[in-house]
Amino acid sequence: MEALKEKILKEGKVREGNILKVDCFLNHQMDIKFLNEVGKEFRKRFEGEKVDKILTIEASGIAIAGIASQYFDYVPVVFAKKTESLNLDKDVYESNVHSFTKKKDYKVRVGKQFLNKGERVLIIDDFLAQGCATKGMIDLVEQAGAELVGIGIVIEKGFQDGRKVLEDLGVRVESLAIIDKLEDNKVYFK
């Protein structure tokens, strides 16, 4: 998606440790008009696919998935929670995940009533790096007996193993921008 690449080049900041900071439009402050274009692009990438639900992970994926939902006939969006909560039923699907950016392990959970056998689920998230969060969401889909349509990623760090990990599982991955490298405070795309 050329408009996304341009926005990353113009507004993104490269940080030490292969971190790309896009908090000015994607995962802190959100450019809603632009995210609408992201949602339309996901619809285009998954044209002809029946989608019953969109699954993401809190927190950065929620807005993206919610906006994308309107282009998939307003299907429900389910987000995996990273923390236990009194308002989350005990009857949950649960998976272990490692966060690349936070450098910690945690469990993600989805109430069993929100992912059902036979549903066609599209996973959408902001970043793909090592693929750990996405693998955790795939595990939740499998536990539910639902069918995975594919993975929609806004920004993929193509120099890390996430895509290979997911494709080795036989999963379709659609990334809107793929970064080849982050070097000398610059972003290079594939």
UniProtKB/Swiss-Prot annotation:
Its EC number is 2.4.2.22. It is found in: Cytoplasm. Disulfide bonds: none annotated. 5-phospho-alpha-D-ribose 1-diphosphate binds at residues 129-133. GO terms for biological process: purine ribonucleoside salvage; xanthine metabolic process; XMP salvage. Xanthine binds at residues 20, 27, 157. It comes from the Bacteria. CDD domains: PRTases_typeI. Keywords: Cytoplasm, Glycosyltransferase, Purine salvage, Transferase. Pathway: Purine metabolism; XMP biosynthesis via salvage pathway; XMP from xanthine: step 1/1. GO terms for cellular component: cytoplasm. NCBIfam families: PRK09219.1, XPRTase. Belongs to the purine/pyrimidine phosphoribosyltransferase family. Xpt subfamily. This is Xanthine phosphoribosyltransferase 1. It comes from Clostridium perfringens (strain 13 / Type A). The gene is xpt1.
